[in-house]
Structure formats: C-alpha cells, structure tokens
Amino acid sequence: MSATTELQFQHVHKAFGTTLAVRDVSFRIASRSFGVVIGPSGCGKSTLLSLAAGLDEPSSGYVFLGGREVRGIRDDVALLFQNYNLFPWMTAQANVAFGLTMRRMSRRAASAQALNYLNDVGLGACAPRIPDELSGGMKQRVALARALALKPSILLMDEPFAALDYQTRKIMQRYLLATRARTGATILLVTHDLAEALTLADRLIMLSGTPGTVQEVIDIKAPHPRDLSHPVLAGLMRKLEAHLEAEAASSEFTTEERNRIMADG
C-alpha cells in the first residue's frame, strides 16, 4: 500500500462532447480517511469516481493520488460499481480469487483468501454459487469482497449498498469502517442515502447543480459508532435534506415545459 493515499481534485472540469458534467471541482480526502460525495441526480458524482480511478481524464484540472497525477488505471485502486460486474460463469469464490491470480498469487492461495473475504461479508456458504444463483444484495457483497481482497490503497465506491436490506447495510457499513481502520485505505463513496453519509464520512462533499460544482465541504469529527440523533449530526441531517430539496425544486420543470414535453410525447 502506498505511503500516502491522499486524494486531491484541483479545479477539475469534465465535459462529454459539448455537455459539461462537472465544473471547477476542488477537494481533498486525507490519507486513511473516509470521504463521501452527495448531491442530486445528474450532478456528476459517478464522473468524479471515474476520474479518480483513472478510467477517464479531466477536460482540465488535475486529480492526484498520493501526490502523483492520476493517469490511467492503477493497481492500488479498486472501484466498486452498482452493477457488480461479476463474471457470470464463475462461482462467487472464483470471482473474488480472479484478481488475486492476475497478481501472480497461486490459485490455491487465491482461492483460500477469497473464501476468507466471502466469510467476512457473510457469504462463505455461497462460495460455490454462480451470480445467477445470488440475490442482488449478495452480488453486491461478492463485489465488495473482490475489491477488498486486492488490498487497495484507495477504494472508490458507487452506491455499494443500494440493494441491501437495512440490517445487512448496517453490518456492511461497520465492516467497511473496520476494514479502513485495519488497512489504512482511503475511501471515497457516492451515496444518495443521507444517513449512510453521516454514518461513514470523515469529510462530506456536497455537490450541486448540473454541471456539478462543490457547494460545501463538511468535516465530521464524531467518533464511530455514531448516534445520528446527536444534536450536531441531527442538525447536519436537516441541512443536507434542505440542500437536496432545494436542488430538486430548482430542477423541476415549469408548467409550460411540462405541457410541451407531454404534447411532444
């Protein structure tokens, strides 16, 4: 793992053709800390993850990881999408082991380590099953096990727990916090779940608008586990809710626009 895993965006713009996705985005996530990005749909949250992962490049500005500019995919970065990306013909255990064998670990050792990570996410008994035999929430946990098995310096996560029930989501949140504490990885997570954001974040990045811009960066000093009924956290929750409600109101169609769309449809 890198000596420093600080992630930094400096005046990043990203356009797709003539459409600007994010505009002048700057923020920093310190080494070994947990950053969470929230904002309305369409504000470029997933775009930021792709830029941090090296899957795409900024139109202007810079992204740094560990003091080095991100240019292309790095071995010490793991990205967990909403859609799992599991190999459908492989068992859960083989899916987790695959990346380890690509790093020249023996198949036997990779298989054993994969089973350990599946046990960590509560799916050891599902190791011999293929993805079609798993629920959506189970697939998400297999994908999480696969990402963590690589022991990344930075873990980038896009709505990783969206398909999980409430109880399993809380278990996975605690597991993720424990893993961060144990490995020292830096984590950047995108979520629409405000309770999840306040439960996990050391630093909260609030995006607004389309194209997405940084409205505010909020540091949360509360220790874990957190009681969201605490006055400070409850106040933050109200602030975040008001922010998203204002964003939703500003993006609503006018009556004239809605009528025109209906007429064209």
Regions found by a protein language model. Name each.
Residues M1-H13, F253-G265:
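ABC-family P-loop ATPase nucleotide-binding domain
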Residues S2-G184, L188-H192, L200:
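ABC family nucleotide-binding domain
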Residues S59, A125, P152, S208, ...:
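A general structural signal marking secondary-structure boundaries and capping sites
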Residues L65, M206-L207:
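Short hydrophobic beta-strand elements within the C-terminal catalytic ATPase subdomain
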Residues A163-Y166, G235-D264:
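Extended, non-globular alpha-helical segments
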Residues A195:
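Residues within helix-turn-helix
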Residues T199-M206:
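Conserved catalytic segment of ABC-fold P-loop ATPases
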Residues G209-K239:
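Conserved beta-strand-loop-alpha-helix hinge in the C-terminal portion
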